[in-house]
Amino acid sequence: MEPVIYSFATLLIHVEFIFGNLSNGFIVLSNFWDWVIKRKLSTIDKILLTLAISRITLIWEIYTWFTSVYGPSSFAIGMKLQILYFTWILSSHFSLWFATALSIFYLLRIANCSWKIFLYLKWRLKQVIVGMLLASLVFLPGILTQRTLEERPYRYGGNTSEDSMETDFARFTELILFNLTIFSVIPFSLASISFLLLIFSLWKHLRKMQLSSRGHGDPSTKAHTNALRIMVSFLLLYSIYFLSLLLSWIAQKHHSKLVDIIGIITGLMYPSAHSFILILGNSKLMQTSLWILSHLRCRLKGENILNPSGNQVTSCYIFCIANKSVS
């Protein structure tokens, strides 16, 4: 691989790594701070908190994989790959199921439907979410009992162990790809069904608005479109994440470092970008982020809040106070 391409790809991976930790870390700290102050969290906040934690773990696993394969002095040891395999699968498992729980939450909370089963599930929303997450634990024994890698030390790029190293790396990505294919069918299908039902609910709602000659800017329409934006981004980014693992597996089979790094770059998009979209789609998180940014701006320009005469208030001060009052 060309040094320039490798350097650019490495820079991009580090940017995604930092961005993903910041966006997910912000969700964790914001909800944790609310819990400390209010001593309680809503169902949606609990889902976002656990989802962000699982994605932070997933981001670190992908980054660890990158440094293990392409680090200048890293050793890939069988036991290390086993630990990386288990933690990667677990973080992917919980990240997918928590995102699915978020999709179902949006569906039951926002959609308008007169079906009896829907009304029953909507009335027992919290129990449905908890029951689904507990049911997801049934799949863990199947994940944890998969055949592990042999314990054999080797150095990436070495002359004597390069073939065995690349074989085990290919086996590693093959195991992850196999598990994600098998165990993600149900949650991904549930999220897709929730997405389709929410589209159907939005269509019915817009049709009702047209018949009543009302505009499309009502709160229900905005809630539908916001939830759909979050759900379609999740489905799209998770599909990209799945394809990134397929790329990595193909790259290990054909010894293509460039394709493997492209797979890592696209894989980091899923846990990083979707969390940023969640922040934009959540009014509380959005207001908190705006308040923090305005507060930092006022801190950086603290000497300019008042003019030299001490009478005129600058726009920085007004912006800071306005955001504080909104939050």
From Swiss-Prot:
Annotated coiled-coil segments of the chain:
none
InterPro entries per the UniProt record, alphabetical: TAS2R
Could you list this entry's UniProt keywords, alphabetically sorted. Answer: G-protein coupled receptor, Glycoprotein, Membrane, Receptor, Sensory transduction, Taste, Transducer, Transmembrane, Transmembrane helix
Segments traversing the membrane:
8-28, 47-67, 88-108, 125-145, 180-200, 230-250, 261-281
Location in or out of the cell: Membrane
One Gene Ontology cellular component term attached to this UniProt record is:
membrane
Q: What residues bear carbohydrate chains? A: 159, 179
Q: Which residues lie on this side of the membrane: Cytoplasmic?
A: 29-46, 109-124, 201-229, 282-327
Give this protein's Gene Ontology molecular function annotations: bitter taste receptor activity; G protein-coupled receptor activity
Protein's UniProt keywords contain DNA-binding: no
Q: Which GO terms describe its biological process?
A: detection of chemical stimulus involved in sensory perception of bitter taste
Tell me the domain of life. Answer: Eukaryota
Instruction: Please give, as recorded in its UniProt entry, the membrane topology of this protein.
Output: Multi-pass membrane protein
Major localization class: membrane
Record bears the keyword Transmembrane helix: yes
List all topological domains (Extracellular). Answer: 1-7, 68-87, 146-179, 251-260
Q: What does this protein do?
A: Putative taste receptor which may play a role in the perception of bitterness.
Query: Which family does the entry's similarity section mention?
Result: Belongs to the G-protein coupled receptor T2R family.
Give any extra note attached to this record: Several bitter taste receptors are expressed in a single taste receptor cell.
Full protein name? Taste receptor type 2 member 102
Q: What would be the name of the gene that encodes this protein?
A: Tas2r102
